[in-house]
């Protein structure tokens, strides 16, 4: 089955986890940024999971170097443009790129300049390729609460101009949602859609709280609802979409293999799952690769994929007009 030619939608892709290695090297040389190696084959080991990874925290260490080259307007625009260029080549028709603006203030940029630069790269790619992109702003859970309020407030002016949603990301502790009730209340009042990283690192109850306390409309990962009956029931009853990233989940040791990943069980039980990369460079993956792995190890069929694609259309934070266009591509999903 040729998954490459099929239309695709990406709802969970981190900008700083999806840089081209060549771009990291090019910017580092241009801006005199020290790297542990300027040899491409050696540098890959610092930014990608090549063989093994022991935990989510170890996985997150791979973002240190990419963020060093994402501190100027020019570089942010270029990296956003290249991401859309790369996924368009994989026949992705719509992507929601997520990133945390406060990771890019090291050289004095303010939040507005950072968001503007990424949006400029997205819009430039839209002009050249058959793709539409929107932006999700991330609040880092390892930063303080005032910083989350700052992102929500300063990003609000871009709602309707390419920014569609707010997210909470980084390492996951039990019962984190309770800390962010007021932040997400403000986000909802501002007009942001809400997606929350939860249930990625072993705590299914976090999904329950993200929905009940934070009004999450979508859940990033969410795979550990399998260990929390109450969360599973709520996700199914409320038809909450899960942004599932199988290869990333293997890398963070959430699961040992594709065969033991609950993705297909969720799909067969009517949970609204979508398929995503999480981080194309860190996990050395594409949507096509994700589909090929699920086909090879879990028996994903073309009929299954059509359900996944339409799930992603419905779950997206795209405009009604864009959703209609995306729905029309479903006719191309044939073996």
From Swiss-Prot:
Keywords: Hydrolase, Metal-binding, Nucleotide metabolism, Zinc. GO terms for molecular function: 2'-deoxyadenosine deaminase activity; adenosine deaminase activity; zinc ion binding. Zn(2+) binds at residues 12, 14, 197, 278. Substrate binds at residues 14, 16. It is an enzyme of class 3 (hydrolase). The record marks 221 as: Important for catalytic activity. It comes from the Bacteria. CDD domains: ADA. It catalyses: adenosine + H2O + H(+) = inosine + NH4(+); 2'-deoxyadenosine + H2O + H(+) = 2'-deoxyinosine + NH4(+). GO terms for biological process: adenosine catabolic process; hypoxanthine salvage; inosine biosynthetic process; nucleotide metabolic process; purine ribonucleoside monophosphate biosynthetic process. Its cofactor is Zn(2+). Pfam families: A_deaminase. Binds 1 zinc ion per subunit. NCBIfam families: aden_deam (TIGR01430). Belongs to the metallo-dependent hydrolases superfamily. Adenosine and AMP deaminases family. Adenosine deaminase subfamily. This is Adenosine deaminase. The gene is add.
């Amino acid at each position: 089955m040729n998954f490459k030619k099929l239309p695709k939608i990406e709802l969970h892709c981190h900008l700083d986890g999806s840089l081209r290695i060549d771009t990291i090297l090019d910017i580092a040389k241009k801006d005199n940024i020290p790297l542990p190696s300027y040899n491409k084959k050696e540098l890959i080991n610092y930014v990608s999971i090549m063989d093994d990874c022991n935990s989510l925290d170890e996985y997150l260490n791979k973002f240190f170097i990419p963020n060093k080259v994402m501190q100027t307007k020019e570089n942010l625009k270029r990296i956003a443009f290249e991401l859309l260029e790369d996924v368009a080549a994989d026949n992705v028709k719509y992507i929601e790129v997520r990133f945390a603006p406060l990771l890019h203030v090291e050289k004095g940029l303010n939040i507005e300049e950072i968001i503007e630069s990424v949006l400029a790269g997205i819009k430039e790619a839209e002009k050249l390729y058959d793709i539409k992109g929107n932006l999700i702003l991330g609040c880092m859970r390892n930063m303080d609460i005032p910083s989350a309020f700052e992102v929500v407030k300063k990003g609000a002016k871009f709602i309707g101009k390419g920014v569609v949603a707010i997210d909470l990301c980084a390492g996951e502790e039990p019962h984190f949602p309770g800390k962010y009730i007021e932040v997400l209340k403000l986000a909802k009042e501002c007009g942001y859609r809400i997606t929350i990283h939860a249930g990625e690192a072993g705590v299914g109850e976090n999904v329950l709280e993200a929905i009940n306390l934070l009004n999450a409309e979508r859940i990033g990962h969410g795979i550990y609802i399998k260990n929390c009956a109450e969360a599973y029931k709520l996700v199914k009853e409320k038809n909450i979409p899960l942004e599932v990233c199988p290869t990333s989940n293997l890398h963070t040791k959430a699961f040992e293999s594709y065969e033991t990943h609950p993705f297909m069980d969720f799909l067969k039980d009517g949970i609204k799952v979508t398929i995503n990369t999480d981080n194309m460079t860190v996990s050395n993956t594409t949507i096509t690769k994700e589909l090929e792995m699920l086909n090879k190890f879990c028996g994903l069929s073309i009929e299954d994929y059509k359900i996944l694609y339409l799930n992603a259309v419905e779950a997206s934070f795209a405009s009604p007009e864009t959703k209609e266009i995306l729905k029309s591509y479903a006719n191309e999903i044939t073996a």
